[in-house]
Amino acid sequence: MNWKGLEVSANFPAEIVCEEAGTGETCITLTWTKGEYKAPALNVTWAVPLVDIQYEWYPLCGRDRALRTDWDAPIHTSFSTGAPVFCFYNEAGQNRLTIALSEVRLEALHSYGVHEEDGTLLCCLKLPLPMTGSAERYSVTLLRLRENMRYEAALRQVAAWWERVSDTHPMPVPTAARLPMYSTWYSFHQETVAADLEAACVLAAQDGFRTVIVDDGWQTSDCTRGYGYCGDWQPAPEKIPDMRAHVARVHALGMKYMLWYSVVYVGEHSRHWETFKTMLLRHDTWAHAGILDPRFPQVRAFLVDTYVKALKAWDLDGFKLDFIDSFGVSSDAPPVREGMDYALVEEAVCRLLTEVREALTAMKPDILIEFRQNYIGPAIRGFGNMFRVADCPADWLSNRVGMVDL
């Protein structure tokens, strides 16, 4: 159907209704008869004259602000990857078109690029529709801002709009999250020996750092990368023989202590491999590890229990929860099977993080939880209170750009 310049369609039998939901807002609702449909999706297409538009920004664009073409691969967004907002602006930094979507949890595919034949910006949006349970209705709101304002002002409007229409709210930020942090990764990589860490923390504390984030390596004597030894989450005794005493010595320096966990991985060499090797989204042979499937309640319970026990046993102040974006999306996941209590990966990850947040804040209300790009969207920010730029070793420019983008 064509509705005020929008071509809206579904690739399966569905009734479509469009209506204005506010200035620049279009609410699209689909209803259908429950049945078996192959890769059902909602498609929305429209064109915008390419006038006074020179640049494009979206949350994971990095240093590339160039306009894309209509044949470029679409940008994927989901609960744990990016955010559904795209801003097109001119040389002066003035907004010419900002596109946002109320769907901040499930997968969306965005293709907004130059169409050479007629000099327009061809906008194509695809939303795979989950056919789970008894769902026979789906609504989504498309926001298009054309006001002449600074593009960062348009983005602030989108952030406020998300809170209103998607019921997303950030996790409270403790004071400690705003103070200087020292991360051990580039200093030590996996060579995280307690005495060396404590010596570095002495210097860090003198320079004003108030928290240390001890990264990958504390849990294994193997320092050859990969994640084959993740999953047991006990300190390597030859590196950190007494974790609680080690944390206490860092606390005595006036620093808080955060610990790294690769949330998704259970390693082939861990004691838990036999338990969880049949509860995986996929097996990463390079990493020598499996990616846990959070649709199984046993997986979620194991992860929550792991963090709760660590917090209690070692008096930690926070967690660096890594690789959450590696859970991926439902369209790439194995079929639903017996033992799962969720059909959608995105919903299961949301449930996992809800349980983690509630369990940890019940024990320590000012707990620090760090996430990184790419999982920085409006829905996931309710579960973390520190967000960092993706790894960019010795690349100060990418780091600065990433900080601004965050």
Question: Language-model segments: what does each one mean?
Answer:
Residues 32, 75, 86-92, 101, ...:
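Hydrophobic, Leu/Ile/Phe/Ala-enriched alpha-helical segments that form helix-helix packing faces
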Residues 37, 50-52, 207-209, 253-254, ...:
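Structural alpha-beta junctions
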Residues 146-174, 178-180, 189-192, 196-201, ...:
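Terminal accessory/anchoring regions of large secretory-pathway or extracellular enzymes
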Residues 178-182, 186-308, 312, 316-318, ...:
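Aromatic-lined carbohydrate-binding/catalytic grooves of carbohydrate-active enzymes
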Residues 241-250, 255, 341-366:
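Alpha-helix-loop-beta-strand connector modules within alpha/beta enzyme cores
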Residues 268-289, 293-301, 305, 347-406:
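Glycan-recognition surfaces
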